[in-house]
């Protein structure tokens, strides 16, 4: 029973083991899942077992062992092998023995698989032990191999280190060798370069020559940078010799090419035109003087670039470049100097006597020559502007040498001014400013020539001012005032009258009507132009010295520098004022003082108006020495003779040096203010003479009465005779009311008779209503004031009411009405002339019209009008700009001027 239970329990255990083994490899939820690598190892072991031989027992996996299979095998085997003995069982003992044998056999058969598995395990154990022994042996051999590897590695590392050291040493030695070879290269090229430079086949324009120059420069620079090397000085000399040979080759080549071009230009072949014939044709001249050189420029340019690229870093190349340029310019000078000289001589012959055309043509020719020469020069070289400028200045000096003898003998200011304009405007401002680099030399010579012309112009202007202004002797026609103005005014009036209209002879002729319309329009246009200026303002009616002064200043203004013009204008205006004053004196002596003064006022106004457009300051600073203190210091020195050598602070000589120093004084002379001062003086004199002419008897009476009253007035106002002093004038026979009445009547008669003449003269000379009103206002006020003084004098000196009635002394209002009525009568008397003047005058100032309106309103007032100052009158007098010629248009008038020849040269 125990065996059966034991067997059952074993079977049960086997069943559990089988179930667990099945769960280990279950596809759904395995207890011990094998990885892919483990399965591969298992397959490898299986294959090894299969390959080991048929004697080896087949492996039995736990999954193949089970109780059902074991029992089935045991049953089948027990059915076959376990049999009863043939004799049978005789007794119980035999049965028990048999049963024991059967049980042992069953038990043995039941454990057969386990025994086989145990054998396999033992076999595997033996194999593993054997494998472990092999692994141990392999590990021993591997350890030995590692030891040997470490030994070899140490040896190899040492060998590698030694090899690297040797390689580094080899590289260092190679670098040292290369460095030595590189440095020796700069010393070993001397012979090779000498051989190349001495080769007869070497061409300067070839690439081999360029390489030679590069090597020479490289070696020279290296040796100069390392002067401490052995034999550096000797090799420097050798390379310098090579450079000298190369420079000689370049110099010979370039000079040969340039000389050939020069020879071909100066001595052309028979089929080429000669120089004299070529100068007459510009294209032929250009081909002759520039064709050969332009052909040679291509050969020289490449070689010149070799030198120019090195000239900035080497003085030898710079000197060689300068020599080549000097040779080129010398050859060009030998070609162009005679040609330029001949051309200028031809121009001089062609424009003989016409200095302006000669200057313009000669300068234009030199401008083209300078531009062509500059263009040709830069076809050969890229640098060298200073040498080119010197060469071009030499060519332009021919122009200067040709023109200067003419300039220093020109006497006419017009010619000198025109030459100045040509040089300054046409040449310097137009041509030179457009191309300043090419025309630098021409600008220098033109500026020198301009300075000579300006110097001559200033000199001739001084002589002109002295001869034609200061020493001007006017003729009777120059002083025929106011006859000249009256004649011109009559001509203006005759032109003002419109011609009677007439019908055309043929109404059907369109040509005749059109031509008549055109003719009428042209006549109207001419008449309009002629009536723009009044007779007194016409340029031809100016006094010759005024006209000449303004013409001279207008020419000098555009020709000379501003400081020079200021000095000349100061002198010219001063002489012009003196000349006008002298002419006014002669007119006053021949005609009346009024004519002379109006003549001077008009021309001073013209002079002031014409110098206004000049944008210069007419102020000139004059410096002088004041020696007034020198005399005082000298007297002090003589009085202190004993203190001449005194060692103290009272040394007489020291005081003389300190106190006797001349003082420098500066005086500012303003020509504009000088004109204003002269105008003020003349206006004052004219106002005085006009008042004297209109109310002369009244002024004489007032002066005589004032003198009498001044003599009879006591020294002290408290004197008892002071009350009788007021009757002294009344008791004088010449101051009786009847005499005063006759004086007043005579004065009124003079006003009525001469006021029209006075205003007529003002209108004739001044030709400007505003100016006439401004000048007439103080005359009017002085006349009114004279009558007011007379009335005050009669009132305060014992004249009774009956005496006042007898004298018929008018009041200020009555005098104003009298002057206004006389002015109206005068205006009616000269209505035609005033209308002509108003139509001839083109414009008037707003300020002047305002003043005129004030004067008209003033005439209706009975109050005494304050007398305006003469300075205000002179400041208010203005000439309408449209009535006078501007300085720019003065030269356009055809004015005949007489110029005397000066012998000061």
From Swiss-Prot:
Belongs to the COG3 family. Residues 64-78 have a biased composition (Polar residues). One of its GO terms (biological process) is intracellular protein transport. It comes from the Eukaryota. Residues 49-78, 884-905 are annotated as: Disordered. This is Conserved oligomeric Golgi complex subunit 3. Involved in ER-Golgi transport. It is a peripheral membrane protein. Component of the conserved oligomeric Golgi complex which is composed of eight different subunits and is required for normal Golgi morphology and localization. It comes from Drosophila melanogaster (Fruit fly). Keywords: Golgi apparatus, Membrane, Phosphoprotein, Protein transport, Transport. It is found in: Golgi apparatus membrane. Pfam families: COG3_C, COG3_N. GO terms for cellular component: cis-Golgi network; Golgi membrane; Golgi transport complex. The keyword DNA repair does not apply.
